[in-house]
């Protein structure tokens, strides 16, 4: 049986958009954030981060926590939208 990809819901879409907005507002590249996540113990490539931002890859809770720490915001801020950070 072929694996089905899981649909990304509204919260995932909002988090993806918020990650991209906060990253670009801070003038940080995807490689920088991915490297910070890796340094924090959550291996991530810039391609993985790009796919998360484009909502082509699901962002699991461990990804979310590492990305939030790399962006110096709370994980909740990523779920609430760019105005919450």
Language model: regions and residue ranges:
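Short intrinsically disordered terminal tails
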Residues: 1, 84-85
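A short, Lys/Arg-rich alpha-helix, primarily the initiator
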Residues: 1-26, 76
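Residue-level detection of the helix-turn-helix DNA-binding "recognition helix"
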Residues: 24, 38-39, 54, 83
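Alpha-helical residues within the helix-turn-helix
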Residues: 24, 35, 69
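Short alpha-helical DNA-recognition segment
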Residues: 27-51
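DNA major-groove recognition helix of helix-turn-helix/homeodomain DNA-binding modules
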Residues: 56, 60-77
């Amino acid at each position: 049986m072929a694996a089905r990809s899981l649909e990304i819901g509204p919260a995932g879409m909002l988090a993806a958009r918020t990650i991209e907005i906060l990253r670009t507002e801070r003038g940080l590249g995807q490689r920088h954030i991915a490297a910070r996540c890796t340094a924090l113990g959550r291996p991530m490539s810039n391609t993985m981060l790009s796919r998360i931002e484009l909502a082509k890859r699901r962002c699991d809770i461990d990804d979310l926590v590492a990305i939030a720490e790399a962006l110096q915001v709370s994980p909740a801020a990523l779920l609430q939208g760019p105005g919450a950070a």
